[in-house]
């Protein structure tokens, strides 16, 4: 396809009149706006058709190397394992294929057995757990259309099941209730003294800051353990909620107090930002199942708990791009079923895409997708421009077509001038569905040019569907919300002891879903499947269809601190590569909201503290900017230039001694060796300063969150490796 043919194709569109636009915009803002221009598409097409870097054709003038010439119209050869990657040996050669056949057969058998096990568990719960009044209350819960009605129904179900008594009892094995109770009491006392004012009020304000530095951190004393939100449909322990409210009130008091200097406040909130971290929303891939993310976004937005840092991969990247380039007011108008009228990426008939697949090796045309995608990204908007417009940080995971090069997480820090729609296309370029594409960058004059020497990129889900490690490196993301819709992963999601907002109902929450035997069999089969997938990968048994190691789509981490699993139906698999109708998108929006409602209380408790810290940072002249954040809002992630004052260390030591003495008296504390000699200054370690009450955190660290059993991939271990292949834009 040439540039001229592309221009003719784009100009064939019939123009609309103003009257037509008013009648057919379906209430969507910018419905008829074409944000991208033909020149940008032409530059993209030139970059796609540009020849790759030529290989060596002569050793010297007298020794030419004759290269094979590919005939026109012939598909490029799919890359295979090179000689360096192929194992040698007689036994390996003889046993590789028989062993691979045995392993694949065993995996198929285990998969069938797993489906039967899940069916048994569903029947067990249907006949033994959800009966009578429980079932009626559960149906009422699932039929709600907004969060307020859902919350009322959840409270009614909790009351019927007797979960309110669990909330009132502070003791629980998964957090340190004694430490939390002591800190709440001290916060309340110091806050009252600070509000009273006077000489004692100023000293109390300093002590309050010291205590806040010690307790405002990620998962302090285990209060962010998901288990604390998995025993009820709504809410958590009353003591935990009391801590959240008291910490929020105390931070507000410090923020507005006249008894503290501006320098003291600035140092405090920088410290808290480093210790507490940021919340990030990750949207997985999943083809057209990614439209369930719209419902997740709508639920978070309507309840004002949508994080500013958003990551998307494959189909999730398209949703994330829409969110990151629109304001809250625009999003509320766009997240409606009528948005389906704007989703036309899969409208070609079978005769069209079948011929294209035969000619190009991919079902969809890159240029058509570029035009469709540009509306969701507001034309050739770059990552930096999107950040400056909305204050949201967009991250898109892309994988190089070379199987051994590192992945990139494109955002306004690593690739500020990269055009968003090109990154979204690259993240969605599944082999056989869409050919690898070239990323584009915007030059100072506004024109586009190839990014990273014209290297081509493909679907990020193949290796880093949920790039949590990279997000932590760049943005100090210590709390993750993952919306997971991949069909090959959703099938195997099962929480035998309940999840956030979805407790086990029988035996007062202390039982197992499907009984102990059902849960044990489910867990055993799942772990055995994971084991054999790793065996195939490490023994290099799998071939590479379409030049891709497909074992990575199973052997990644797909969950976060809070994982949202929208409930799909079998028809979704049939329409997995089809545009949604208004009715289907309405159902997806509803299901996305329904599965998000149980998680909102957990998320809102986290965001309540995080936003007060952000407000405190905005009062810092070095951080405040024109938007919600400064152009460098994450500076404290690596800031090591803020030493603690000597008197603050002395106050910290005195207060820490008092707290430790109280815990020793109650028998809830054991001495542990300190990592710093007495009198040595406290300095940041690896970009994070030790808190003033590190001992309390260390003692409470025995209560760990539930972790994912799946081993992270190599890309998760090393998410960002300096972009040695020219992946940064100057």
From Swiss-Prot:
It is a single-pass membrane protein. It holds the Pfam family Patatin. It comes from the Eukaryota. The keyword Electron transport does not apply. The active site is at residues 314, 459. SUPFAM superfamilies: FabD/lysophospholipase-like (SSF52151). This is Patatin-like phospholipase domain-containing protein CIMG_04897. Probable lipid hydrolase. The chain crosses the membrane at residues 97-117.
């Amino acid at each position: 396809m040439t540039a001229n043919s592309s221009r003719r194709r784009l100009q064939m569109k019939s123009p609309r009149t103003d009257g037509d636009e008013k009648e057919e915009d379906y209430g969507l803002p910018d419905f008829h706006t074409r944000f991208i221009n033909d020149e940008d598409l032409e530059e993209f097409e030139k970059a796609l058709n540009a020849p790759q870097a030529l290989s060596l054709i002569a050793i010297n003038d007298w020794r030419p190397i004759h290269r094979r010439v590919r005939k026109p119209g012939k598909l490029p050869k799919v890359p295979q394992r090179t000689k360096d990657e192929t194992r040698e040996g007689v036994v390996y050669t003889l046993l590789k294929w028989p062993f691979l056949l045995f392993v694949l057969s065993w995996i198929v058998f285990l998969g069938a057995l797993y489906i039967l096990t899940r069916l048994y568990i569903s029947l067990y719960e249907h006949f033994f757990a959800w009966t009578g009044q429980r079932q009626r209350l559960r149906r009422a819960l699932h039929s709600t259309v907004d969060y307020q009605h859902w919350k009322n129904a959840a409270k009614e179900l909790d009351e019927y099941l007797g979960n309110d008594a669990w909330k009132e009892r502070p003791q629980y094995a998964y957090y340190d209730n004694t430490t939390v109770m002591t800190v709440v009491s001290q916060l309340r006392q110091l806050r009252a003294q600070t509000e009273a004012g006077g000489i004692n009020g100023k000293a109390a304000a300093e002590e309050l800051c010291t205590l806040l530095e010690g307790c405002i951190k990620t998962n302090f004393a285990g209060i962010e353990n998901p288990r604390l939100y998995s025993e009820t449909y709504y809410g958590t322990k009353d003591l935990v909620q009391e801590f959240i409210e008291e910490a929020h009130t105390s931070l507000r008091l410090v923020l507005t107090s006249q008894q503290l200097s501006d320098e003291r406040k600035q140092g405090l909130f920088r410290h808290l930002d480093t210790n507490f971290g940021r919340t990030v929303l990750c949207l997985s891939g999943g083809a057209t199942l990614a439209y369930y993310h719209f419902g997740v976004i709508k639920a978070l937005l309507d309840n004002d708990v949508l994080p500013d840092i958003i990551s998307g991969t494959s189909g999730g990247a398209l949703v994330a791009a829409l969110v990151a380039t629109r304001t809250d007011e625009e999003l509320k108008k766009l997240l409606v079923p009528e948005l389906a009228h704007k989703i036309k990426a899969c409208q070609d008939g079978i005769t069209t895409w079948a011929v294209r697949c035969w000619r190009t090796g991919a079902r969809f045309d890159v240029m058509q997708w570029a035009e469709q995608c540009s509306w969701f990204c507001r034309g050739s908007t770059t990552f930096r421009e999107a950040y400056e417009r909305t204050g949201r940080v967009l991250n898109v995971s892309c994988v190089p077509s070379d199987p051994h090069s590192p992945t990139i997480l494109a955002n306004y820090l690593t690739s500020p001038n990269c055009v968003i729609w090109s990154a979204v296309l690259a993240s969605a370029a599944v082999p056989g569905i869409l050919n690898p594409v070239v990323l584009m960058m915007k030059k100072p004059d506004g024109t586009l040019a190839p990014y990273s020497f014209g290297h081509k990129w493909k679907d990020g889900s193949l290796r880093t569907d949920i790039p949590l490690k990279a997000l932590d490196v760049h943005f100090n993301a210590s709390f993750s919300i993952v919306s997971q819709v991949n069909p090959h992963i959703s099938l195997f999601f099962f929480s035998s002891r309940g999840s956030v907002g979805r407790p086990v109902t029988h035996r007062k929450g202390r039982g197992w879903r499907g009984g102990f035997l059902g849960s044990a069999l489910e867990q055993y089969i799942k772990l055995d499947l994971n084991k054999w997938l790793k065996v195939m990968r490490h023994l290099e048994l799998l071939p590479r269809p379409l030049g891709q190691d497909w074992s990575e789509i199973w052997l990644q981490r797909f969950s976060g601190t809070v994982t949202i699993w929208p409930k799909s139906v079998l028809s979704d698999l049939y329409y997995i590569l089809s545009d949604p109708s208004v009715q289907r998108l309405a159902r997806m929006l509803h299901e996305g909201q329904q599965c998000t409602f149980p998680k909102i209380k957990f998320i809102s408790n986290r965001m309540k503290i995080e936003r007060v810290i952000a407000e405190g940072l905005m009062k810092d002249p070095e951080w405040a900017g024109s938007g919600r954040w400064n152009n460098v809002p994450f500076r404290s992630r690596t800031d090591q230039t803020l030493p603690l004052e000597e008197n603050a260390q002395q106050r910290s030591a005195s207060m820490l001694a008092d707290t430790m003495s109280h815990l020793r008296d109650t028998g809830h504390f054991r001495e542990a060796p300190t990592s710093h000699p007495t009198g040595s200054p406290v300095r940041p370690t690896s970009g994070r300063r030790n808190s003033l009450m590190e001992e309390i955190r260390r003692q409470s660290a025995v209560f760990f969150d539930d972790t994912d059993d799946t081993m992270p991939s190599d890309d998760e271990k090393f998410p960002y490796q300096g972009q040695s292949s020219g992946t940064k834009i100057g």
